[in-house]
A protein has these predicted regions:
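Charged, heptad-repeat coiled-coil alpha-helices that serve as long linker/dimerization "arms"
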Residues: 2-133
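Short, hydrophobic beta-strand segments
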Residues: 133-141
């Protein structure tokens, strides 16, 4: 019984560890460090005394800052979920606590789901991807 529980947690740990390279790839694909630098530059612009004189520019800067912060926050939340899931697995495995298996499974699934969503969002982050689209379907061979 205890061996079975330990095996289940080991499988979960391996499943979670397989996601780590994809999470690291996502960090470089998003360009988290570059985005943080850009946020700092935009916040410096917003702190300038003449920032509000050009309303269009100020709104664009604030909107861009908000979008960039959302990207970084989403990535950081993914990393936090990864760490929390790993901690749950380690604690449950050390204590041979079968009651935490459902929670650990759920945590790993959440990390997988969030990772896939962020990968898709990263793929659809081009200049025009935030715009609406009109699709037309035509019958034919």
């Amino acid at each position: 019984m205890i061996e079975n529980v330990m095996l289940q947690y080991e499988e979960l740990r391996l499943r979670l560890e397989e996601l780590k390279p994809a999470i690291d790839d996502l960090k470089s694909a998003i360009g988290v460090e570059k985005i943080k630098q850009e946020i700092a530059q935009l916040e410096d612009q917003a702190a300038a005394p003449d920032f509000w004189e050009d309303m269009k520019n100020s709104q664009a800067v604030l909107q861009k800052t908000s979008q960039l912060k959302a990207k970084v926050t989403a990535y950081e939340q993914l990393c936090s979920k990864y760490d929390d899931a790993m901690t749950t697995i380690e604690i449950a495995d050390e204590e041979n606590d079968e009651s935490l298996y459902g929670e650990a499974c759920s945590a790993v699934s959440d990390v997988e789901k969030d990772l896939e969503e962020q990968k898709l969002t990263t793929l659809l982050s081009g200049e025009y991807d935030a715009k609406n689209a009109i699709l037309a379907f035509h019958a034919g061979a």
